[in-house]
Every structure is written in structure tokens, then in C-alpha cells.
Amino acid sequence: MMEVTAKLKGAPLSAQKGRLVADMIRNMNVSGALDVLKFTPKKGAKLMLKLLESAIANAENNNGADIDDLKVGMVCVDEATTLKRISPRAKGRANRICKRTCHITIKVSDEE
């Protein structure tokens, strides 16, 4: 059994929106997950596609794994730091804008 991990830290995406995409590819074959991510019109899908391709490349290069046997094991989307910005409003007031980020972890394994 071989398990390979790829991580993306501080992705400019809220964890809630990232989890919507993560739920679609969890426990899928790698080829099926790539197809799903390519045709999903979400920002998180684009980020996870690059991360999944990185995990596949890690498995191939470091462990000599066969792509056809690989399966997406764990997809974890956790909250990261929130960037706090200020938007000026009328009469000298200001509103806070929270730009949320997340950490995405994908584990790929050849386990059935």
C-alpha cells in the first residue's frame, strides 16, 4: 500500500466553497476525478485540479506508481488565516471585509 500527499496552503478560497468541490471527488478513481474537476465551473475545481495533478506526479515520480490503480483517498479542506480588509462607507464609517483562505490536502493511494 502506497499513499502520497499533496498540500496547498493559503489558497484564496473559502473553506465552505472548497468543501463543495472536495465532496465531488472523494473516493473516486484518479482519472474520473480529473474529468469531474475539468468540467466543474468553480474556482475551487481549478485549484484542486492542479493539486490532484501534483499528487499524481508525486506518486509516479517518487514511488513509481501506475496511474490506473490510483484512487483519491482523503480530500481535506481546512480554514486558514482570514485576511481582514476595510471598505470605506458613508459618513466616515468603514466596513470590514474578510477574505477567507483555506488549506487543501489531497491523499492519493493505490489501495482498493
Swiss-Prot record:
Transmembrane segments: none annotated. GO terms for cellular component: cytosolic large ribosomal subunit. InterPro entries: Ribosomal_uL22, Ribosomal_uL22_bac/chlpt-type, Ribosomal_uL22_bac/org-type, Ribosomal_uL22_CS, Ribosomal_uL22_sf. Keywords: Ribonucleoprotein, Ribosomal protein, RNA-binding, rRNA-binding. GO terms for molecular function: rRNA binding; structural constituent of ribosome. It holds the Pfam family Ribosomal_L22. GO terms for biological process: translation. Belongs to the universal ribosomal protein uL22 family. NCBIfam families: rplV_bact. Part of the 50S ribosomal subunit. PANTHER family: CHLOROPLAST 50S RIBOSOMAL PROTEIN L22-RELATED (PTHR13501), LARGE RIBOSOMAL SUBUNIT PROTEIN UL22M (PTHR13501:SF8). This protein binds specifically to 23S rRNA; its binding is stimulated by other ribosomal proteins, e.g. L4, L17, and L20. It is important during the early stages of 50S assembly. It makes multiple contacts with different domains of the 23S rRNA in the assembled 50S subunit and ribosome. The globular domain of the protein is located near the polypeptide exit tunnel on the outside of the subunit, while an extended beta-hairpin is found that lines the wall of the exit tunnel in the center of the 70S ribosome. This is Large ribosomal subunit protein uL22.
